[in-house]
Amino acid sequence: MIQTSVFTDDFSGLNPLEVPLVEDGREAIYFKENRGEIGQWQVVNSLRQQGFNEAWQVKEGIDGTSLIQTFTNLDQNNEPLSLTTHPIVVAGDSMWQDCKIEVDFTPMAKFDKCGVVFGYQHPNEFYFFGTEGNTVILKHISQPVTPLRPFERILEYKDLVWTPGEEMHAVVNIRRNGVTTILNDSIVLYNEVTVLPGRIGLISDMPAQFNRVEVSMLKGEIRKLSRKKRQLARREEIHLKNYPKMVRWKSFETGAFGTDQNIRLGDLTQDGNKEILFARSSNKGKSVCCITAMNLDGKIIWQYGDTLAAKQEWGGEIPFQVHDLDGDGKREVIFISQNRIHILEGLTGKGLNRVKLPRSMEISSLQFGDFLGTGRDNCVLISDNKSRLLLLNEKLQVLWEQEIEEGSLPLIYDLDGDGYDEVMAGYSVFDHEGSLLFNSGEFIGDQCNGVTLTELVEGELSTPCLLYAAGDWGMMYVDFEGHVLKQNLVGHVKYLSVADFDTEVPGLEVISSNAWGSDGLVHMSDASGTAKQVLTSSSYVSRCVPVNWKGDGEEFFVTSADSVSGGLFDKNGELSVEFPNDGHPVNCYHVSDLTGDARDELLFWNQEKLWIYTQDDNPRMGATYSPDRYPLYNHSMKQMNLSLPGW
């Protein structure tokens, strides 16, 4: 049967100097449009192993240009990292199903996998055909059932005598009732398996060279695919009409004082409206060089420091907040710079107080809580998010300090309802006096990326618990006494949020986003901790921020500010609100109610401009959903989110 080519790449169009944008660990905070791109291909995962993220490169030789994989997928102890993940690039259409794939490749070693990926859903769900050791093999790789161990099912294999450096020619024929694979026109494998639609890819756990890829389909399949795409586009068009569209409300040029991730919101002028605070650090680190306060009309209220200082591109988070620390009804701007805590008058930016911290430490977060039982969040919690906590009162006097084995951004919350806040940092929980209540980390085998609160519902029983983003150990549910209740293995969980994403079922849902080996994999779990939906965000790792867009009690979530890969998505992972393709900035985003109708606006910005979007039916009349969230004065880009129902 004659087939028509739908994809061809001999890599001749690639620049030998072209390398994919290297993962820097802050992909959820700073969106970069070309992340992982190398020609028509996309690097799908990253790993905490030197050399892994730079594995795919372009090589120009006597025989032409090739795509090469340069990394040996072993750890420092020569243990196989393929138990965790693989260097993979993918291309093509996620709806490809019945097709023929041909790949010419040259493995430079034989200890692990090298070959073709097809039926690709995400980094933990795909089919593989190629060489593995002294075999030619067909496998199905699927979601892990234990930490760091994706399930690999051998479908067919045959012994293979070969020498590293030999060029291989692989053919994969996918039909509805099975897969036929051929290596070097001689070794045939067949398995009756139904392969879901998915992209194609290249995989290698060892240095290898890929010379040519072609995908072809029957003309009838091409017509069927085009028809299905039209149907899906029409369905999406109808779905999008059900919700308020996004329109630009405000836009400002901020080149003179713009910043990276370091924006805060708060009512500085006591007029009932939030103002925007821009903080800029020096190139030397987290020392504050300037702060600018601007209202929602774009008017600069005041500036502090040296606005002419050079910007730090893609910098870390500066410890600064907007909060009424002394309880006089007027908010202050509080920040830490050069081992001193500074307090500025919110209305004017005038310095009110400056105190040197009792010991030198690298400060990463600044938060507030009620540790004295006064009914006000008048205590200052300072942390390096790694190993140290320091608590001050409103006069900036030390109340207590603690060292922890392994920390995270702290969460401040009154767990037992006694009027005094507790601190959750890493897997450790401290009471208001700094005494350790428990540490559940001894039961968990990876670092804590963050913690939030939820209720685990099992039948008639509902248990308040801490929910940890536990890295390779997935999501961990721990009760308020430190007992592990449930583990949900969904890959390396980096961020998570709890909100009412589905009003048709009881309880709150959890959305989680992965990194390190399963980048961009998003799971929607119900109140029992069972994953109900799985999707792959093309924006890669997402902060999973809930968005109260409709105001009817059901929230969406945002993946990124990009008009192509971003948007607001619903409980089923369907795009529900498109972001305008109008040239808006896409590097950073923030979610908050700015117009006063209880629904959220979205702020998109880079270092040169900031745009604000709202609903096209704003303001909303009648009862409007107004969820209860962690206070803005404890905001961090690293936080795990909680959005409790409220009207």
Where are each of the predicted segments found?
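Beta-strand-rich recognition domains
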Residues: 96-97, 109, 162, 174, ...
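Trp-centered recognition loops
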Residues: 97-99, 104, 157-171
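Beta-strand signatures of extracellular beta-sandwich domains
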Residues: 117, 137, 180-182, 292
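Secretory/extracellular carbohydrate-interaction modules
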Residues: 71-144
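Beta-propeller-forming repeat regions
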Residues: 1-50, 54-55, 60-61, 65, ...
